[in-house]
């Protein structure tokens, strides 16, 4: 217990000293994660006016907020989460589990015949602190996100996902290479150096899996 207490104290100290936390508070952004996405969007020029962007596991809304800010008033931002999320201007929110057919049907009804240009996933499980538990949970969420993109992302579209480096992540990236013309691994500046997280970008969705 004492070591956990020290770890918690260290995390809190780092969190409140974090320049991206301070920036998020000053700029009214919902999470520091918005700045990870901002760097990735700019570096790879992922957004164009009028795009349709889907944000999986969107709560508390930092990524959706950043997409809407970056895209201006054009296009559509559709956020999905099993958790509640307070409303965001210019963001359509669907509350539910996208593994359930009823939720998927509602999502498809929201979109109509409009193709999805970009799928985002910053999903992560609640951490137990044990890699043997956390990594399989993370990879399961990543599989669900990839399957969602397989079904709903247009040919030529892009998929950006957070992964934890560890068991299963290399195999997952190989699967992405079968699905996308170009796959890139990124570690944005706002990502804590000690964190095992990386962001993997698939661009140019193939018409068929190789």
Curated annotation (Swiss-Prot):
The active site is at residue 162. It is found in: Cytoplasm. S-adenosyl-L-methionine binds at residues 61, 63, 81, 97, 122. GO terms for biological process: RNA methylation. One of its GO terms (cellular component) is cytoplasm. Its main location: cytoplasm. Its EC number is 2.1.1.166. Pfam families: FtsJ (PF01728). NCBIfam families: PRK11188.1 (NF008390). This is Ribosomal RNA large subunit methyltransferase E.
């Amino acid at each position: 217990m004492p070591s956990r207490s020290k770890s918690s104290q260290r995390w809190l100290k780092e969190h409140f000293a974090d320049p991206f936390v301070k920036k998020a508070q000053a700029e009214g952004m919902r999470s520091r994660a918005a700045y990870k996405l901002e760097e990735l969007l700019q570096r790879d020029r992922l957004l164009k006016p009028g795009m349709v962007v889907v944000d999986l596991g969107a709560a508390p809304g930092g990524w959706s907020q950043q997409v809407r800010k970056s895209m201006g008033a054009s296009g559509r931002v559709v956020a999905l989460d099993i958790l509640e999320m307070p409303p965001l201007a210019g963001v359509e929110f669907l509350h539910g589990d996208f593994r359930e057919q009823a939720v998927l049907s509602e999502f498809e009804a929201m979109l109509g015949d409009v193709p999805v240009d970009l799928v985002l996933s910053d999903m992560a499980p609640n951490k137990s602190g044990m890699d043997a538990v956390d990594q399989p949970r993370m990879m399961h969420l990543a599989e669900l996100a990839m399957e969602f993109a397989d079904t709903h992302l247009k040919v030529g579209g892009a998929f950006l996902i957070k992964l934890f480096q560890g068991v299963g992540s290399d195999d997952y990236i190989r699967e992405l290479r079968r699905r996308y013309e170009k796959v890139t691994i990124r570690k944005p500046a706002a990502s804590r150096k000690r964190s095992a997280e990386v962001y993997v970008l698939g661009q140019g969705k193939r018409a068929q899996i190789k």
